[in-house]
């Protein structure tokens, strides 16, 4: 029995190691500002940078602006617009031609509701976010895969994507401590494909309240079935927020 358990454990470790070699590693960093206009109503701005390909390549830049309203003590609504400038990796077409990497703009809108409940020092929250992303059409350079000679530009058709992102999160309030650890799981459902799961994210992180106006966020994230504008696999993240 012990031998069987050992072999089963060894198989799991080998499988995980092989999978880890296939996964990418990305770095996500962000800087944001939040302002309370009046009671229960906030506005926010955020800029973000993401890398991919084992941290060696720029993945995307983005900027967002949003508003949030606290409906009750346990329910909050928010909406935002995000402009994404995505670095599309090079690819080979079905005919063997080469399309070098190119920058691609995307427009994203979302509306979300977040409900929370506290139990002792734990706080559990459920966030449901409807998200729509539109990729405008554009023409990109294309070259012959054999001799590298220029070909007629490739036309990339515009495309929209509707998803529902469901995130369950737990935070823990440590007595007399400026650090707040959290863990979450998020599922992304494709609304254009009968709710099929497009992506799963697992996150472990900690929020660090430096002062009344300054805060940091550090986290590790793993995701599978990632879409094209995000690293598939492991992500290390850091964010800074200024509240005034």
Report each predicted region and the residues it spans.
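Outer-membrane beta-barrel translocator/channel fold
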Residues: 52-54, 58-60, 70, 74-136, ...
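Repeated loop/turn-to-beta-strand initiation elements of outer-membrane beta-barrel proteins
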Residues: 40-45, 74-79, 120-124, 176-180, ...
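Residues that define the transmembrane beta-barrel architecture of outer-membrane proteins
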Residues: 25-27, 59-61, 105-109, 158-164, ...
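Bacterial Sec-dependent N-terminal signal peptides
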Residues: 1-27, 242-244
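Residues on the lipid-exposed face of transmembrane beta-strands in outer-membrane beta-barrel proteins
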Residues: 31-35, 65-69, 111-115, 128-130, ...
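Outer-membrane beta-barrel transmembrane domain signature
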Residues: 123, 127-215, 223
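Flexible, solvent-exposed coil segments and beta strand-coil junctions
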Residues: 42-48, 84-95, 144-151, 181-185, ...
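Start-of-domain marker
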Residues: 21-87
């Amino acid at each position: 029995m012990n031998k069987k358990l050992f072999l089963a454990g060894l198989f799991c470790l080998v499988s995980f190691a092989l999978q880890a070699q296939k996964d990418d590693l990305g770095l996500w960093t962000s800087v944001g500002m939040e302002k309370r206009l009046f009671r229960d109503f906030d506005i926010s701005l955020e800029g973000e940078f993401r890398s991919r390909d084992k941290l060696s390549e720029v993945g995307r830049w983005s900027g967002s602006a949003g508003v949030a309203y606290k409906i009750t003590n346990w329910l909050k609504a928010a909406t935002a617009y995000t402009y994404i400038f995505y670095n599309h990796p090079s690819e080979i077409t079905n005919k063997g031609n080469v399309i070098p990497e190119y920058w691609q703009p995307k427009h994203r809108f979302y509306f979300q509701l977040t409900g929370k409940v506290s139990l002792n020092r734990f706080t559990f929250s459920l966030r449901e976010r409807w998200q729509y992303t539109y990729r405008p059409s554009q023409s990109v350079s294309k070259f012959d895969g054999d001799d590298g000679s220029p070909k007629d530009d490739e036309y990339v058709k515009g495309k929209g994507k509707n998803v529902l992102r469901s995130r369950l999160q737990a935070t823990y309030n440590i007595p007399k401590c400026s650090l707040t650890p959290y863990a979450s799981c998020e599922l992304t459902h494709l609304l254009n494909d009968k709710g099929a799961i497009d992506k799963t994210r697992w996150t472990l992180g900690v929020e660090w309240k430096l002062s009344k106006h300054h805060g940091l966020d550090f986290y590790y994230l793993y995701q599978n079935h990632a879409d094209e504008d995000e690293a598939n696999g492991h992500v290390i993240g850091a964010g800074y927020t200024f509240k005034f």
